[in-house]
């Protein structure tokens, strides 16, 4: 069993924010892989299903981004999961839009959702699926960028990326992050 967490903010008006791409990815995975209906649990929304034969618990924290760990920690403790069974899908400023990278461990790089999870799990040794949203170029514009909505011109690459992540998800569930990244890249090569 694995816990896959999509990061985002729960306000309906923030649903299309760049910061919510983690929620979007988990929603597409749960939908396309036939997960059970979402229900409230662990200060979040939870859905269970199977990806590539692996049982997955999907979690969308309703704690707001900066307190995501308040949902992740109790969920991982309840299911008795070690940190390396947790995968967090999140927005990544340092990747161009549509680029996807997976890594285990590492710092929060200024991402408050990751910082909260690091603090509550007591470790950084969990998996991250970094979903590129691009950098606005000026550090002073970062806050407005991540909390801004995706533009209509982003729609093609965004939909293609989210569908590719879902289509490649069985490789991620099987513990093959390199193969997952390769498949996502191949599926999005004309749009990212």
Curated annotation (Swiss-Prot):
What residues does the record give for site: Stabilizes the basic form of H active site to accept a proton?
Answer: 91
Origin: domain of life: Bacteria
| One Gene Ontology term of the molecular function aspect | peptidyl-tRNA hydrolase activity
Source organism of the structure: Acidiphilium cryptum (strain JF-5)
Cross-referenced PROSITE patterns, in alphabetical order? Answer: PEPT_TRNA_HYDROL_2
Q: Which Gene Ontology terms of cellular component type are present?
A: cytoplasm
Q: Does the keyword RNA-binding apply?
A: yes
Xref: CDD domains: PTH (cd00462)
Q: Which family does it belong to?
A: Belongs to the PTH family.
Question: Site: Discriminates between blocked and unblocked aminoacyl-tRNA. Where?
Answer: 9
Q: Which Pfam families match?
A: Pept_tRNA_hydro
Keywords for this protein: Cytoplasm, Hydrolase, RNA-binding, tRNA-binding
Q: What is this protein called?
A: Peptidyl-tRNA hydrolase
Q: Where in the cell is it found?
A: Cytoplasm
Q: Does the keyword Lipid biosynthesis apply?
A: no
User: How would you summarize the oligomeric state and partners of this protein?
Assistant: Monomer.
Q: What is its EC number?
A: 3.1.1.29
Task: List the InterPro entries hit by this protein, alphabetically.
Answer: Pept_tRNA_hydro, Pept_tRNA_hydro_CS, Pept_tRNA_hydro_sf
- Reactions it catalyzes: an N-acyl-L-alpha-aminoacyl-tRNA + H2O = an N-acyl-L-amino acid + a tRNA + H(+)
């Amino acid at each position: 069993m694995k816990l896959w967490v999509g990061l985002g903010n729960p306000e309906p008006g923030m649903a299309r924010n760049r910061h919510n791409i983690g929620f979007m990815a988990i929603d597409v995975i749960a939908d396309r892989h036939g997960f059970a209906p979402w229900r409230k649990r662990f200060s979040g929304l939870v859905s269970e299903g199977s990806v590539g034969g692996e049982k997955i618990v999907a979690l969308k924290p309703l704690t707001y981004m900066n307190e995501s760990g308040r949902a992740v920690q109790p969920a991982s403790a309840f299911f008795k999961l070690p940190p390396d069974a947790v995968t967090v899908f999140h927005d990544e400023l340092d990747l161009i839009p549509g680029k996807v990278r997976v890594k285990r461990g590492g710092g929060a790089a200024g991402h408050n959702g990751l910082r909260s999870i690091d603090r509550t799990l007591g470790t950084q040794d969990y998996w991250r699926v970094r979903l590129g949203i691009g950098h606005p170029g000026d550090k002073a514009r970062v806050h407005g960028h991540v909390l801004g909505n995706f533009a209509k011109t982003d729609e093609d690459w965004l939909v293609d990326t989210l569908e590719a992540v879902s289509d490649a998800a069985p490789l991620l569930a099987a513990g093959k992050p390199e193969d997952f990244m390769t498949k996502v890249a191949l599926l999005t090569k004309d749009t990212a």
